[in-house]
Amino acid sequence: MLLDGRKTADILNEALRVKVQYLTKKPKLEIILIGNDEASKSYVKGKLNTASNLGMEVHINYLDEAIDQLSVEALIQKLNTDKGVHGILLQLPIPKHLDSDYLISLIDYKKDVDGFHTMNQGLLFQKKDGIRPATPLGIMMLLDFYNIPIEGKHVVIIGRSQIVGAPLSKMFLDRNATVTITHSKTKNLPSITKQADILVAAIGKPKFVTKDMVKVGAVVVDVGINRVDKKLVGDVDFEHVEPIASYITPVPKGVGPMTICALAHNLYALYLKQEKE
């Protein structure tokens, strides 16, 4: 059965839209887009469309690819102090001459809609209230929408990034799952993935997960977005894995829409916190 991220996001977003219309002012998101990366432009367009449809305000700061570090830092500091701005998002990747880690650390963690700031990462790992990274949050929202049990399940995550793998592992742990994280140095990977009740692929390698790596009846979550022969494909060989999986996310229309959905919910949460202060 498909885990339909597009359909789920539409339903959850509609519920959020109703909440937003009763707010005294619109939650506002500032997006910083540096350079002309076509994939980044596409992602930003999706975020803009979703937020606008929800009654939220979005402003995109288009910056030249050759912009210097200090200029980006100055923009972030300006947005940090603007009380009319509730969320700030630095669209990744950015040009290599810029320090993305430092720029993310400059964003006020109370406006960190992506959940990448070290403060929000720390709050997650201390099991305290904070903004969760959007892709892991979107995955959890999707599994919950389909009432997929998590407690007591063996979750195997392929990929250990700070954006997906590491925070997602903690979110599963907090739901009482048994979690195994695998990566490029893991030996005998198929023998591990085949034990998974829930298998998450987040490595950026097209069709990496094959049928022989998946247990019959497993739930398969494909985070990958890879362009092959002008088509988008995931990290999972969908055609051959889908028949043996109990649930599986497609690419596209799987995790992607849920990431944007989670971003919108994060912006709403940031708005509520800031308006209380």
From Swiss-Prot:
Keyword hit for Transport: no
Keyword Ligase: no
Stored InterPro entries: Aminoacid_DH-like_N_sf (IPR046346), NAD(P)-bd_dom_sf (IPR036291), THF_DH/CycHdrlase (IPR000672), THF_DH/CycHdrlase_cat_dom (IPR020630), THF_DH/CycHdrlase_CS (IPR020867), THF_DH/CycHdrlase_NAD-bd_dom (IPR020631)
Molecular function via GO: methenyltetrahydrofolate cyclohydrolase activity; methylenetetrahydrofolate dehydrogenase (NADP+) activity
GO CC terms of this entry: cytosol
Binding site for NADP(+): 159-161, 184, 225
E.C. number(s) listed in UniProt: 1.5.1.5, 3.5.4.9
Reactions performed catalytically: (6R)-5,10-methylene-5,6,7,8-tetrahydrofolate + NADP(+) = (6R)-5,10-methenyltetrahydrofolate + NADPH; (6R)-5,10-methenyltetrahydrofolate + H2O = (6R)-10-formyltetrahydrofolate + H(+)
GO annotation terms (biological process): L-histidine biosynthetic process; methionine biosynthetic process; purine nucleotide biosynthetic process; tetrahydrofolate interconversion
Keywords for the protein's UniProt record, in alphabetical order: Amino-acid biosynthesis, Histidine biosynthesis, Hydrolase, Methionine biosynthesis, Multifunctional enzyme, NADP, One-carbon metabolism, Oxidoreductase, Purine biosynthesis
Pathway listed: One-carbon metabolism; tetrahydrofolate interconversion
CDD domains in alphabetical order: NAD_bind_m-THF_DH_Cyclohyd
Entry superkingdom: Bacteria
Quaternary organization: Homodimer.
Record-stated family: Belongs to the tetrahydrofolate dehydrogenase/cyclohydrolase family.
Function: Catalyzes the oxidation of 5,10-methylenetetrahydrofolate to 5,10-methenyltetrahydrofolate and then the hydrolysis of 5,10-methenyltetrahydrofolate to 10-formyltetrahydrofolate.
Protein name: Bifunctional protein FolD
